[in-house]
Amino acid sequence: MSKPDRLAILALAVLAVAASSAQAQHQYIGYVYPAGGQQGSTFAIRLGGQRLTYASDPVVSGEGVSVRLIAYYRVMGNQEMSLLRQQLRTLQKKGATVSDAMAAKMAFFELPKRVKPPEVRGIVCDACGRLNPPFATVCSNCNAKLVKPKAPKPGKPAAKQTPSEMEAARQKLIERIQRRFAEDERNPAVRAHMELVFAEVTVAPDARPGRREIRVITKHGISNALPFYIGQVPEVARRPMKTCRKPVLGKEHLAQRRRPTDEALVRVTLPCTMNGQIAAGEVNRYRFPANKGQRLVITTKARHLVPYVADGVPGWFQAVLRLHDDEGNEVAYNDDFRFDPDPVLYYEVPEDGDYVLTINEALFRGRESFTYRITIGELPYVTSIFPLGARAGQPVKIEANGWNLDDTVLSPPAKDAKPGRHLIAATRGNLMSNDVPFALDTLPECRDAEPNNAPAKAQKVTLPIIVNGRADRPGDWDVFEVQGKAGQTLVAEVHARRLGSPFDSFVKVTGPDGKIIALNDDHYDAASGLNTDHADSYLMAKLPADGKYFVHIGDTRRHAGKAYAYRLRISHPRPDVELRVVPSRICIRSKSSVAVTVYAIRKDGFDGPVKLSFKDLPKGLVSSGATLAAKKDVTRLAIKTTLTEMEGPLNLTVIGSMKVGEKTIVRQAVPAEDRMQAFLWRHLLPAETLPVLVYNPSYRPPTDRIRPPIPDSIRPKNAKRTLRKSTVNWYLRQIESLYQQWYLTDDFANRQIANIEARLIR
C-alpha cells in the first residue's frame, strides 16, 4: 500500500471513530496487574480503567481460568472523600461502635487481597548478600560466617482476646476506608486509569499456557480486551503502584514513586516469573543464585501487555534489561529482540554466584500501565523456524533454532487446520516454549535451491507457487524464473516479518534484458495490527510481452543466517479481502440499536463490493446487513435489539461475502480495537472474540439498606439556613450513595443528614 493509501485509511479511521462516539464511550481497561499467573494457582489482580460502574466478575478467554470480583473503587468526589475522612475520625474515637446490621455486613465483607513480594526465607550473608538456607552456618558463596537473626525476646504472653463482633466490624470498616484513601489520587497523570477493579483469579492445573484475553463485564457494557498470560513456573509480584500523579514541570520528582528500601530489590529462585510495574525514574532489581553451566533464558513481556500508548514516544513501554554479576559488573544487556521491542537475553552462567537482573524504561518514563512479566530459567525458547509455513493438509518437517531445545518436539498445526496464521510451540513433556507463527496456504510450495543468486542461475518455478527460502550468506540474492504473457499481472508477496523473521525483504521483477519492471521494499499491511515494522515486500507488475521474467529477493540490509527465512508467493492476482470489525465488543441499550465499523483490507487488486452480515444472530437481535461499496475501505454495520437486557454477553461473528468471477468467497471479520500510537499512528489491534451485551441504562443496584429514623435529639436547633434545596439534595445524594455502599454507619449518616437539612433555606 502506498503512503497516500495509508494516510487515506488513517483519515477514514478518524472519521469512523468520530461517528462511533457512542461505542467509544463504553467501558475501558488500560492495564491489568499482574498480567497473568501460574497454572494451578489462585492470585489477586487489579485492573485500572474507566466507566466500570456496576462491575461483575471479569472473564478470561479459553478454558481453565475463572475470575471472581472482590471490589470496585469508583472515582469519588471531594465531598465524598471529606465524608469518609470524617467517618474515619469518628470510628477511631474511643468508644465508637457500629450497628448490628453493619456488624453482620462486615462479617462477610471481603477486602481486596494484597499483591506483594514473597517473604525472604533464609539467612542473608552480611558480606556478599547471598541468600542461604535457614539451617546454613557459613555462606555458600564467600564462606563467611552467617549471623542468624535474633529471635524476639520472650516476654509475658499476652492474653488472647478475640474482639467482639462489633469491634471486629469497626476495625474492618476502618481498614476499608483507609484502603480507599491509600488508592486515591486527586491529580492523576492518566485519568483513564482512575477506576479500579479488584478480583481473584483461579487457574486450573491443566489450563493451557500462553496468551489469553481478559475483559471486565458491567451492568452497562463490556470493556476492551487486554492480554493475560498463563505461565508454567512459580511467580512473584511486586506491590502494585498507586495511580501516578500528574507531573508538574520543574517538580517531576513529586510524581515519582518512592519504593520502600526493603522493596528495592526482590530475591527470587529459578525458574521464576516476576511481575512488576515501572514508575517514572524507577529501576526494578531481582537477585537470584545461579550455578556454573546453567543456560538461562530471560524473556520479557512489556509491550505485548499494553501494545500502544497514545501519549508517548515511543508509543509503548520500551523495556531495558541488564544482568550483573555478584561484583556489580554488567554481563548482559538487551533492549529488544530483533524487531520486537520486548527484550530477550540468553546467558550461559560462567561461575557460581548471585546475579542481579534490572529492568527499567529506556527513557525512565513510568505509569501504572507500564506492567511487565519477566521469566528466567533454563527454559526452551524458539528463536526461529524453517520453513515459515506449509501447504494445508500436507506433512512438513520443521527445523527449530533456539535455546534449551534438547529433547523438545515442534509439531506443525493439525492436518485439518485451515489456511491462515497459526501459533506453534516446542514441547518437552508438559513444558512449552514460546509461541511462534506458522502459515498455511492452499498453493503449491517449494524450497529455494542454491545456487540461484543471478538470472543466469535462476531457479525455474511454475505459477502459482510459494517459495520457502532464506538468506544463506550476507548479500545473498535468490532469483526465480517464471514464464509470462503480455498483459498478464504478476504478484510477488513476501511473508517474513509478519511471521517473526528478521528478514527485511526487497523484491524486484526484471525482464530477460535485465530491465526492472517493478520493485518494492516495504509494504504497509493494516491487517497486521501489532506490527509497526512493515518490512515485507509486495508488488503487482503488468508484463509487457510474452517470455521469461525473473523475480529477485534479498535482504535490504544484506543480513543473513538461519533466522532470515521468508515465504515468497509468486502468482497471478488472487483477489481477496481481510475484514476488521471495530470495536471488539458491542454494547446495546434496551430496545435500541448501534452500529459497528467494518474495515476492508483489499488484496491483489480486488475492488468489488462486499456484503456484510452477522452470522446466526441469537433471538432478540436483528440486523439487515450492509454492503461495502466497490473501491471503498470502510462502512458501518447496524444491529438492533428487542430485548430489555441480557443476563450475560454472547459472542457474535461478522462475515463478508464477495464475488470474484463466478466464485463467491466468504471471509470472517476479525474483532479489533482502533488504537493510537505516539500521538498520530492508528492501528487495528485484533481481539479473539466479539461479545455483545444488551443493557438497561436505568439499572441501579437495589437499595438493600434502610436507614433508621433520625432522632430529634441530634437535629441542630439554631443552624444558619444558607443552603438552597438543590444544594441540599446534592449533599443528601452523596451521603446516601456512601451509605448504600456500607461506608457510613447509621449514626454518622443520620447526623450528617440532620446537619444538612437544618441548613435548608425555607
Where are each of the predicted segments found?
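Bacterial N-terminal signal peptides
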Residues: 8-18
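Acidic, Ser/Thr/Pro-rich low-complexity intrinsically disordered segments
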Residues: 25-90, 267-432, 440, 444, ...
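Ligand-binding face of N-terminal immunoglobulin V-set domains in extracellular IgSF glycoproteins
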Residues: 39-51, 60, 82-96, 164-229, ...
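Surface-exposed binding patches on compact interaction domains or structured appendages
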Residues: 56-116, 155-189, 605-627
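Short, cysteine/histidine-rich loop/knuckle motifs that typically chelate Zn2+
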Residues: 126-127, 141
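Short Cys/His-rich micro-motifs in 6-15 aa windows
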Residues: 143-151, 757-761
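Aromatic sugar-binding surface patches on proteins
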Residues: 182, 189-200, 340-343, 408, ...
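Predominantly extracellular/luminal regions of secreted and cell-surface proteins
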Residues: 227-269, 429-465
